[in-house]
A protein has these predicted regions:
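Phosphate/pyrophosphate-binding catalytic cores of soluble transferases and nucleic-acid-acting enzymes
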Residues: 1-221
Length: 221
């Protein structure tokens, strides 16, 4: 095939990767009127009551989705209202044969201690680059805590720091801990859910990278 049509996809979010690797049954398009009705109902009831109402029609999704996850709550409600089938039904329609495309899956699984050290340093770099000022600016415009941006790792801790509710050292420590826990969940997901073609545990090992490159060349034919 044309080499320019070959794609390299890099990411760490397990659910997106799962959807990419498996050809899922397409969910019918949701009419705008249903989307509007769902949002109005959620705003009227509040997230917690809306989730309880969702559980009567789609208990599987309601159990999986946290009350604060507005977007996913709305999506589950919209799908059921439009199709009269729960979102879990559509997720179960994935084909066992997987995607029509061929993938060579490379998984980066660094040693946990090294990974956690990088997580800690990464957040310190954010601090040096002005993350606290960004947190203060975001808080000043009263962004909804239910928006995805408000769930950024470390944001809540930095906002507490800017309000004088936490010392900077405590905010950093708590944010670093949250980041490490997130990384741990990702490692667990990849270990149990991804059937990789090549595993890289040491990025600085030239032989490992060379071996991976050779396998990719063989895969491409």
């Amino acid at each position: 095939g044309d080499v320019y049509k070959r794609q390299i996809i890099c990411g760490g979010t397990g659910l997106y990767i799962k959807f990419l690797l498996n050809e899922l049954s397409a969910i019918p398009e949701i009419p705008p009127s249903i989307k509007l009705e769902a949002r109005e109902k959620l705003e009227d009831l509040g997230n917690k009551n809306f989730r309880e109402l969702l559980s009567k029609n789609d208990p599987v999704s309601a159990r999986r989705i946290k009350s604060g996850d507005t977007n996913r709550l709305l999506r589950a409600w919209e799908v059921f209202t439009a199709t009269n089938k729960p979102l879990s039904y559509w997720h179960e329609q994935s084909r066992e044969t997987g995607s029509q495309h061929k993938f060579f899956k490379v998984c980066l699984m660094p040693e946990r201690k090294a990974l956690y050290s990088k997580c800690d340093k990464r957040f310190l770099d954010f601090i040096e680059q002005g993350a606290a000022d960004e947190a203060r600016a975001l808080d000043s415009i009263n962004v909804s805590p239910e928006l995805p941006a408000s769930k950024t790792l470390g944001l809540l801790e930095l906002i507490k720091y800017t309000k004088g509710e936490l010392e900077l050292s405590d905010a950093v420590e708590q944010a670093q801990r949250a980041t490490r826990l997130y990384a741990k969940r990702q490692l667990t997901w990849f270990r149990h859910q991804l059937d990789e073609d090549f595993l890289i545990q040491n990025l600085s090992c030239s032989k490992t990278v060379s071996d991976c490159f050779k396998k990719i060349v063989n895969f491409l034919g």
